[in-house]
């Protein structure tokens, strides 16, 4: 999963 996915 992408790094900018803040726990979404």
Curated annotation (Swiss-Prot):
UniProt protein name: Allatostatin-A4
Keyword set includes DNA-binding: no
Principal cellular location given in the protein's record: secreted
Compartments, as annotated in UniProt: Secreted
Tissue distribution of the protein: In larvae, detected in midgut but not in the CNS, ring gland, abdominal perisympathetic organs (aPSO) or thoracic perisympathetic organs (tPSO) (at protein level). In adults, expressed in brain, and thoracic-abdominal ganglion but not in corpora cardiaca and corpora allata (at protein level).
Organism: Delia radicum
GO terms (BP aspect): neuropeptide signaling pathway
GO cellular component, one term: extracellular region
Recorded family membership: Belongs to the allatostatin family.
Keyword terms: Amidation, Neuropeptide, Secreted
Function of the molecule: May act as a neurotransmitter or neuromodulator.
Key word Cell cycle present: no
Modified residues (Leucine amide): 8
């Amino acid at each position: 999963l992408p790094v900018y996915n803040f726990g979404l």
